[in-house]
Every structure is written in C-alpha cells, then in structure tokens.
Amino acid sequence: MPLTLIQRDDCHLCDPAWEQLAAAGVADFESLWIDGDAALEARYGVRIPVLRREEDGAELDWPFSGEAVRQFLAG
C-alpha cells in the first residue's frame, strides 16, 4: 500500500512520527516536503506530520501511535 509522510524541514515532530511508523512495521513510504510550496504549506502547515494513504487519499494527522497507524492501514 503506497504511503506518503508529509513533512517539512526542521520538523521536531517528524522524528517521533518516523518512530511510530517503525513501531507499526511500516518500512516503505515516500516523503513529501511542503517547504517552498505555498499550496502545500497552506493545506498542511500546522498539521504536519501527516500520513497519507495514496490509494484513497485518507490522511492521519499527528499525533499518532504505532497502533493508530496499524488501524489506519487496516482501513
């Protein structure tokens, strides 16, 4: 299942998000950096990090736990 972690440079919450993805067994995901993209910054600026399921566009906003990620992936 294709996943994207939406993040920005110098995001102090992104490292813990990576840890929760690892705890959920998620090893493969793309990163989308919002820096410098006005539309993405407007949409995600205060929400990051956000995990997006590419197949249906569903999004899981931070904070999330490993268990929340597993439930999100289960659909």
Tell what function each PLM region has:
Residues 1-23, 29-31:
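Local sequence-structure signature of Cys/Sec-based thiol-disulfide redox active-site neighborhoods
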Residues 27-38, 45:
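Thiol-based oxidoreductase modules, predominantly thioredoxin-like and allied folds used
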Residues 45-52:
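Structural micro-motif
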Residues 55-75:
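Non-catalytic, surface beta->alpha helical segment in thiol-disulfide oxidoreductase systems
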